[in-house]
Amino acid sequence: MKITNETRELLSNLAGINKNFLFKRGASQTSINHSNSIYMDANIEFDMTAESGLYELYEAGVYDITKVVAGINSLECPEIRFSENSLSVIGGDTEMIFALTDRSKLKVPTKTIKFPDLIDCKFELSSNKITQIINYAKTVYGSTKSFLTGFVLIVGDGRTINAQVQESHRTANDVLKINLGECDQTFRFMVSVDNLKLLMKDDYVVEYSPKHLCRFSCKSKKTIYYCSTENID
């Protein structure tokens, strides 16, 4: 199977959420981070036919998908091929072979997420505003290689939606305030900046459920993120 630029981008994003990954037959490829706070469902269909051509794999687990992505990015016109016990990334005269791992040894989603029918709000969030939030948190609150400090409090007052970036759940000393548009709903929820940084660069439709769950739907790709919200009661 040849890897398109879109598939390359989606795999890179999946790798950023969790290095454990399970290729699955069908168009829905999912990943969940180790704290269970963000779940990604991407529309990528892989040809799971084994190299022998005699059968099709149902799933193929990889312990560290970041290595596979690095292999893909190092080759021109790369392809992925599956065999019973390994996955190959092929480009020209080069073949990189990665051993498969049983799903029992991987941190991967065990079920799909059903978003609640009842939602408190629905609004659009641009890629530029997400980038603005992330850059502010990095600059003002600091970050490590694996964690970005900060939270985003999103409030609708029946007229406008505003986002406030702050260092902690309760502390709001140094803050960034951004107007996100108009609304006729009243709501209030908080998400971590560390989860926002895992979203693919895109504009989003955001929906919030009072069951402490947000859905971020990409506007240009068939990709959805489910993000847990912080307890601010």
Q: What is the meaning of each model-derived region?
A:
Residues M1-A99, L118-D233:
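DNA polymerase processivity clamps
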Residues R103-F123:
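Long, charge-dense
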